[in-house]
Structure formats: structure tokens, C-alpha cells
Amino acid sequence: DSEDATAAEAAAAGATVRNWRDILEETPRPGKGESLWRGVAAATSDIVVFVDADLESAAPGMVTALTEPFVDPHVQLVKARYRRSFQGRPTGGGRVTELTAKPLLRQFYPELGHIDQPLGGEYALRRDTARQLPFVDGYGVEAGLLIDVAQRHGAHAIAEVDLGTRTHRNRPLVELAPMAEVVAGTILSRAGVIGPVAQRPPLMGRI
């Protein structure tokens, strides 16, 4: 039901495009996590790779790099690590990551404190693992998946690959504040500090 020609542009570029009605019957909810959850439901390969749509620095080989660590059978999640550009400078981006996600993860999940880009949108999951996890509705989805994989499989099941410098649209603070609130809520919820956040249930057993 795209109104901005996203589906048509993707199909023209050679992507397989499926309507949500053909994947799951539930009425779609707004939010990034909803799209990723449905993507997992539609996937048929052993590995599912996610790449943010506003990425301006995608390079050939990026998807391959994200999947290579899965030669180790213990690896369940692969996160990209990179430098975040900001206003023309090679570093300084990722403000929600640096000011919200990382401090909270170090406080409540110190075993994840070394993860370079906990909120990064470029990552890969084993499909069987993804189907066993809930997906937070909105921008907290990456934090939720990171914590859930670590709790189920251990932090050693999370690998990182260096993808250089990431360039994408830098949002104004007025847009980042709600994102930071959702990310903080997800981490605090997983830590048992506050109640549950809105999320889709695991797909295992549903399809």
C-alpha cells in the first residue's frame, strides 16, 4: 500500500516485492519493527539481512560481509560497526546511540557494552533465531533484538564486522528525542525497570 512509489521503485530495481496481505493477515501497525517482523515472515533463506533504507554509503560486498561470520555455527547475530558521519565530518553521528543506548546498555547489560553500533540498521540474523524473538514495534527493535539474542545465546553469539564510514540522513533533535525515548523504554523494559513495550510476538509456530 505504498503511497510514495517505494514498491514500484524496488520492483524496477529487481527486488521481490510482496504485499503485507500475502504474508501475515494481521493489520499492519506503524513502526520500523513491524516492517522487520513481516520481512522475517516473508524470508525463505537461512540468513536474514537488514539494511536501513536511508543509507547513503552502501557499498558492494556489504551484505556478503554481514553474512560471512555465520560460518561459525555459534554466531546468531552479526552487527555492522562503522564510523558515523555528521554534517560533513567523518565522525560525530549516532547521537541516540552515544547518548542513550550505550550508557543504558553499559549500566544494565555490561556484557553488551563493547557493541559499536547497538542501534545500527545494518545487521544479519539466522532466520530460525529471528523467528524465535519478539520484535518491538518501533525504533527500539534493534535494542530489543540485541538484548534478546544475548540473553538466549550469550553475548559471544553476537559478531561485528567493520563497514567503514556510514553516511545517512542526520535528523534534527526534534526527531531524535522521540526515538531516544523509545530506545530507552525498550532497554529499561528488557531490564525489568518498567513494564512491557508494544511488540509483535515470535513467528515460530505461526507460519
Which functions belong to the PLM regions below?
Residues 171-207:
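Terminal low-complexity segments of carbohydrate-biosynthetic enzymes
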Residues 51-54:
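Active-site acidic Asp-centered loop
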Residues 45, 73-76, 155:
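Short, high-confidence coil segments that cap the C-terminus of an alpha-helix
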Residues 1-8:
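A conserved acidic beta->alpha catalytic loop
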Residues 26-38, 58-129:
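Acceptor/aglycone-binding surface of glycosyltransferases and processive sugar-polymer synthases
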Residues 12-14, 44:
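Short, structured coil segments at secondary-structure junctions
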Residues 48:
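Short aromatic/hydrophobic "clamp" motif used to bind/position activated sugar donors
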